Amino acid sequence: GKISMKKRSRIIPVLCTLLVATFLFGTVSATNISMIGNTVTEPPLTQEELEHISECNALIEQQLARDNLTRAIYNNYLSMSVITQENGYYCGPATACMVAKTLGLGTYTQKEMASLLGTTTSGTSGAQICNTLNSLLSKTSDTRRFQRVTISTAALETSVRSSLRNDFPLTLNVKEMPNYTSGSGHFIAVKGYYFNTSTDFKTITICDPHPTYSGTYTYTLEEMETAVESSNGYYNRLDASTV
């Protein structure tokens, strides 16, 4: 039916408030941050890459088996500073900048790194990050290289231990984080870990470039496994054959 002028005067401000809120924040949700987006399709692993991952997994098992004979607690933390991404699709460049600086490969602006990566408004792929960082490493005396893997082809726990025991960071593609949900995909860097194999207490420390939640955070191993699985499952670790 018809709305009286008195009722209409009360409704209009409410509607305006809702419209403004929707425009500024999108769908209201405490955990859905719509400004984050990385929709680039990750190229599938080739047969050659899969075979090399298996070879590296065997090398890692040998390395860690020797470690397990001497102690039950393992931990290492890299000196990595958080870089907050400048826009909604620069999580890849920001993460690559953090890793490059940590490895002594130079200090890049996010725009410079985005150019090297080939980042578009759709974001960046893990393959682009892996290849670009390896290209920068090849220009130094550092023989270590990144290897692109999936959580189904390489266990995150052993990858983290292997990489960080060699002072080498990892990059993860995540979606469902413990404190927020990315609309599509989001890159973060792993800077440290603490694993107690006798009590099964295991944590991973990451640097997150998220424009709202940027910072250093520590989560359980299980939480980070879930975060990677919720996205495309890809991440970049140390190629164990290059150590």
Task: Annotate each language-model stretch with its function.
Residues 6, 19, 85, 165-167, ...:
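Short, well-ordered loop/turn elements at secondary-structure boundaries
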Residues 8-30:
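Sec-dependent N-terminal signal peptides of Gram-positive bacterial secreted proteins and lipoproteins
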Residues 32-50, 54-69, 73-78, 111-243:
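Conserved active-site-adjacent core of cysteine acyl-enzyme catalytic domains
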Residues 73-120:
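Active-site nucleophile-adjacent alpha helix/oxyanion-hole segment immediately C-terminal to the catalytic cysteine
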